[in-house]
Structures are given as C-alpha cells and as structure tokens.
C-alpha cells in the first residue's frame, strides 16, 4: 500500500512537471501570438520595445510584472533589449523622447526610467520640460550639462532613430515588442495566470521569434 501510494505520487509529480514544461515550450503561432510585418527599415534592432512614460501598461511591464527583466535574463550576452520612446503620446512626448536619448547617452537610463515613470504616473509632479531636467538633477547631472547633451550629435541621432522607427514600423500602441524587424508580438495572447507566468511566456516567445529563420 505504501509503495502504491509512492508510485501514484511519483506519477502525479511527473505529470505536473510535464504540464508545466508544455506550457513554456508551446508552438507559438503567427496570427495569434505574433504578426508578421513587412517593414522597410534597414538593419532593424534584433529586439525593440516601443514605450511611453505616459503608458500605464509600460510602467507595469518595467516595474511590476517585470517583463523587461524576464526578457533580459534570457537573452544571449551579445544581445540587448532596445527601448525606444514614442513621441506622439502625451503633451511632453517629444521632450520625454529627448530625455530618454540623453539618459541612454549618459548611461543613466536604468535610473531615469523609474524616476520618469513615477513622476508622471505616481507623484504626478512632472508637468513641464523643466521638471524633466530636474529628474536628471537628482542624479547629479546639472541643467547646464543636460543642455549640452541636448545638442550632442549622437543624442540627436538617437532621437531621430526612435521617431523614424515608430513611423516606419507603424507603431500604434504601447508597449509594443518587435523582433528582427519582422515580428510584432501580440501581448494579449500570452498566459494570464499571474505576473511571473506572463513575464516568462513573453520571454519564451521572444526567444522563439529570435530563433526563427529570417
């Protein structure tokens, strides 16, 4: 009887592990989990997320659901998740795209991202372009240094790159993930059980698409 119970318990464990593995090794489908697009972008980033600091789901993906973290943990060492800001959203959209370019150039994008999200969506104390600069002041970047970086050629090029890709890839919502310039992920198609499952499913889908032959 004891042996019989142990066998049953073992079989149940194997079954549960099998079901769990199946959930994360499913065959993702075009038209359901992602859309095949035909963009004219030359040398698109392998993986890019379009977002806005005004976007509630974007904030959740970055800070609560931890989608970005789950994806970064699974990427090869020589690949990164690019994040491009959408200027068309909100009254400070263009200024925020510029701020994001400055943050990336200065290497403080990881810190600036959280502060800008909180300032716009939690504290709601970012009302003007000057308020955006004050976020950088908190990180030790003076207003003069910020103004200097605004005029930097590389910063201007990054702003143009973001705006250009938004237009050419026909980005109509955020957060939007594009893989290899060819696949647009359908966020709503992923597992909705809980935050961890959703983030893991997104990371799996990203890897699935990265490994698809072009």
List the predicted regions and their residue ranges:
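Sec/Tat signal peptide C-region and signal peptidase I cleavage site
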Residues: 19-26
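A structural motif
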Residues: 104-111, 135-142, 179
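N-terminal secretory signal peptides that target proteins for export/translocation
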Residues: 1-6
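A short beta-strand-turn-helix
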Residues: 28-46
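Bacterial N-terminal signal peptides
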Residues: 9-19
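Structural cue for short, hydrophobic secondary-structure segments
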Residues: 49-51
């Amino acid at each position: 009887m004891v042996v019989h119970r142990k066998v049953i318990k073992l079989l149940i464990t194997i079954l549960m592990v099998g079901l769990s593995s199946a959930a994360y090794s499913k065959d993702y489908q075009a038209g359901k989990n992602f859309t095949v697009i035909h963009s004219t972008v030359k040398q698109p980033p392998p993986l890019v997320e379009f977002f806005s600091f005004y976007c509630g789901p974007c904030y959740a993906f970055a800070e609560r659901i931890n989608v970005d973290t789950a994806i970064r943990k699974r990427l090869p060492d020589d690949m990164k998740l690019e994040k491009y800001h959408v200027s068309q959203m909100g009254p400070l959209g263009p200024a925020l795209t510029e701020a994001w370019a400055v943050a990336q150039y200065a290497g403080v994008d990881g810190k600036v991202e959280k502060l800008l999200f909180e300032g716009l969506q939690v504290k709601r104390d970012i009302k003007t372009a000057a308020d955006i600069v004050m976020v950088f002041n908190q990180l030790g970047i003076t207003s003069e240094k910020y103004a200097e970086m605004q005029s930097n050629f590389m910063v201007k090029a990054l702003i143009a790159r973001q705006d250009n890709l938004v237009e050419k890839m026909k980005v109509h919502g955020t957060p939007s993930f594009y893989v290899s310039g060819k696949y647009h992920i359908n966020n709503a198609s992923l597992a909705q059980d809980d935050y961890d499952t959703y983030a893991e499913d997104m990371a799996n889908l990203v890897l699935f698409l990265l490994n698809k032959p072009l």
